[in-house]
């Protein structure tokens, strides 16, 4: 298993006109603000078994991305970050926040590598896996700012088989809300066990209110470190940033198979 990413057939190398570095993995566009992330968060590279390169979308913070109605000025810094990641040699590009879904089509058309701007890209897949008699629960940071533009940009048909719950609007998750919304960036911090219990409580409540739920999708990258605990509590398939990034890398850099016959 240790050699799954090792290509034993490299006998010659040649300069590529499209990139500066080699052996790269995923490029992740991050917001221009400071907050910490537990292992599994998209801005914490330590938990992922493949290379991650970060680039900041300069001038774009989370509050702007979520709450500003006019997002036209954000496209240029996101495009700039995507182009830099492509130029350095990243095999695929992702966003760090699910609300980057707003720009999925624009960025996918701007670079020549696969683009995975939001974990919401997995909703249509989840819908197809569970059938029309069940719904996909979508747990987002704020449901009040998730629009049809976000949904349609990643292929989600409005009013199809999904239900949405917001972390902020629930009132059940003060610890993780403060991590991202505290006015002083240097005061931002969080306790792992507190967030874990908050998210479990919210997920269980969400499921109990929608017993027809057949899968859960986590939009917020900060919920990824707790995906396993959430799954153990509700016993459903869980789609997250972790499943998206694993998939993105497997598409861009296919592994070899070793075994015996």
State where each predicted segment sits.
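Non-catalytic positions within long, well-ordered alpha-helices that form the structural scaffold/packing
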Residues: 86-89, 127, 207-209
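N-terminal active-site wall of soluble small-molecule enzyme domains
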Residues: 72-81, 99-106, 110
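C-terminal functional extensions of proteins
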Residues: 219, 223-225, 231, 239-261
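N-terminal glycine-rich anion-binding loop in soluble enzyme alpha/beta folds
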Residues: 1-75, 142-145, 151-191
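Gly/Ser/Thr-rich loops at beta-strand to alpha-helix junctions
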Residues: 34, 92-104, 117-122, 141-146, ...
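Charge-patterned, long linear interaction tracts outside catalytic cores
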Residues: 187-228
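Short, acidic/small-residue loops that bind anionic groups at enzyme active sites
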Residues: 106-130, 232-249
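Glycine-rich, highly charged phosphate/nucleotide-binding loops
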Residues: 67-81, 194-202
């Amino acid at each position: 298993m240790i050699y799954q990413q090792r290509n034993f057939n490299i006998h010659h190398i040649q300069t590529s006109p499209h990139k500066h570095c080699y052996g790269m993995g995923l490029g992740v566009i991050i917001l221009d603000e400071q907050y910490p992330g537990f292992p599994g968060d998209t801005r914490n590279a330590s938990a992922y078994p493949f290379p991650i390169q970060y680039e900041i979308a300069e001038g774009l913070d989370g509050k702007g991305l979520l709450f500003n109605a006019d997002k036209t000025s954000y496209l240029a810094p996101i495009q700039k970050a995507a182009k830099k990641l492509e130029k350095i040699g990243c095999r695929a590009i992702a966003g760090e926040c699910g609300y980057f879904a707003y720009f999925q089509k624009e960025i996918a058309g701007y670079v020549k590598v696969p683009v995975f701007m939001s974990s919401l890209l997995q909703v249509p897949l989840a819908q197809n896996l569970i059938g029309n008699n069940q719904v996909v629960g979508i747990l987002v940071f704020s449901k009040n700012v998730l629009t049809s533009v976000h949904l349609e940009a990643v292929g989600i048909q409005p009013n199809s088989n999904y239900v949405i719950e917001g972390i902020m609007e629930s009132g059940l998750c003060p610890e993780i809300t403060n991590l991202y919304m505290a006015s002083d960036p240097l005061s931002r911090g969080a306790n792992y066990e507190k967030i874990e219990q908050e998210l479990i409580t919210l997920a269980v409540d969400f499921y109990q209110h929608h017993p027809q739920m057949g899968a859960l999708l986590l939009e917020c990258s900060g919920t990824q470190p707790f995906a396993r605990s959430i799954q153990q509590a509700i016993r459903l398939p869980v789609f997250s940033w972790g499943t998206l990034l694993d998939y993105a890398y497997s598409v861009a850099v296919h592994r070899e198979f070793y075994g015996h016959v």
